[in-house]
């Protein structure tokens, strides 16, 4: 029987409706499409995670040494999201098309570069599989709709931001600003569950709250306690979850971040300055508020 004729997924009545309202309405073909789309987008998320911090670093170095820009650009190859083509980060061997197939290429090469035999980071298949699972979750939550695709964009952007921040303490503007504007435009077009006025209020208040916290901390302690990227991320999240979800979102992020910080401090892995990335906790809490509809009940 062709896959397009497979019957819809069936579960006991009401078993999943409380959290995944569209679970019983989607077909296996639709699940397959979203799962494959997740693998493909997950591969692109890996590109963002690897290249965006390097691009930001090079841009900062170029601005610090503006007189040497021509020398630097001639000495180093142009770096973008599509240039140079995908290659091994160890030996810079250009990858063939069959070495770019999500997950399968990693497994078939036994997690090693086919050219230099260097080990490939486990992050690559992990991100691809995670994105695929999250995209499938979006389908179960919103069904075969444009809203599901919007939710896929939301989850992929948060995954990229969380991982980049955890590794580099950076939250690239190109992603946070895209997240903000897509959220606002999607709300205006009724492609997200949040009315436009709540999305606008959430974005403004989200930025303002963390700006106030950051200003108070800097005035009190005489040093910066929160990066500008966190402010922009909460503004973007506010556009997606609305103003009434900001307080629960901040509470969840703060509590989970505090627990993580205490554990890292006890293990002696927090560092002398006591800093750790807050973006992943904002991203995870924003994801929970968006998909579970967590708000102040207004």
What are these regions (language model features)?
Residues 291-298:
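Juxtamembrane boundary at the C-terminal end of a transmembrane helix
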Residues 92-147, 151, 230, 235-236, ...:
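Multi-pass membrane catalytic core of lipid/isoprenoid biosynthesis enzymes
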Residues 29-56:
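N-terminal signal-anchor transmembrane alpha helix
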Residues 34, 147-256, 298:
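Functional transmembrane core segments of multi-pass inner-membrane proteins
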Residues 51-123:
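Membrane-proximal soluble regions of multi-pass membrane proteins
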Residues 1-29, 298:
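Short, strongly hydrophobic alpha-helical membrane anchors
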Residues 227-232, 262-288:
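Interfacial loop-to-transmembrane junctions
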Residues 46-51, 110-118, 158-170, 211-224, ...:
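C-terminal ends of transmembrane helices
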